[in-house]
Design a protein with these regions (language model features):
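Conserved alpha/beta-domain cores
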Residues: 1-131, 137-139, 151
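C-terminal helical cap(s) of enzyme catalytic domains, especially alpha/beta-barrels
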Residues: 137, 141-187
Length: 187
């Protein structure tokens, strides 16, 4: 089966439902409602996980932990085309994998409380990446994201900046008068 693990924009829901069996990144009630509506039109029953921003980092997607219970309640009552399977989170980046443990534990505890409150099973916890997946599994992860472990490090992306013809000549670059700016690669 195919899993969508990245951010999903509401205008891309139909396309995502055509391609993926499981969506790990449902980060708002509005998105869940949109998935339910489009799934109903398409005659589908998508499996989803709610993405929770356990760390509170502004750079991370996901709903606030305090919004999860209300979202689950609404999905169970008002979104019959959705199969809610669990929760997903991403821990803050750290060189020390143990730093991720409290975030993974908090997500597991949240899942356990939701199962008890709503008398439902939420068998999936999607958490942990190449640098911290062992800790995630110890804390209950059922799905991990292992890009670097499987495919290696990403290539370094070089930064480019536009330069004027004068700067280009001073920097040893040939001047360029084509369609687009002259750029200098910064290592």
């Amino acid at each position: 089966s195919w899993h969508l693990i990245g951010h999903l924009q509401s205008n891309k829901v139909r396309h995502a439902l055509e391609l993926f069996d499981v969506i790990h990144s449902v980060d708002s009630l509005k998105l869940a409602e949109r998935i339910n509506l489009i799934a109903d039109e398409m005659g589908l029953q998508p499996r989803i996980l709610l993405e929770v921003n356990v760390s509170g980092e502004k750079s991370k997607s996901g709903m606030k932990p305090e919004d999860v219970e209300g979202t689950v309640s609404h999905i169970l009552a008002e979104c019959p085309r959705i199969t809610l399977e669990g929760l997903m989170t991403m821990a803050p980046f750290s060189e020390n994998k143990e730093d991720a443990r409290p975030y993974f534990r908090k997500l597991r505890e949240m899942r356990d409380a939701l199962e008890k409150k709503f008398a439902i099973g939420l068998p999936r916890l999607s958490m942990g990446m190449s640098g911290d997946y062992e800790v995630a599994v110890e804390e209950g992860a059922t799905w991990v994201r292992l890009g670097t472990v499987l495919f290696g490090e990403r290539p370094k992306i070089k930064t480019v900046r536009p330069v004027s013809g004068e700067d280009a000549a001073a920097g040893g670059l040939d001047s360029y008068s084509g369609a687009g700016p002259t750029v200098k690669v910064l290592d």
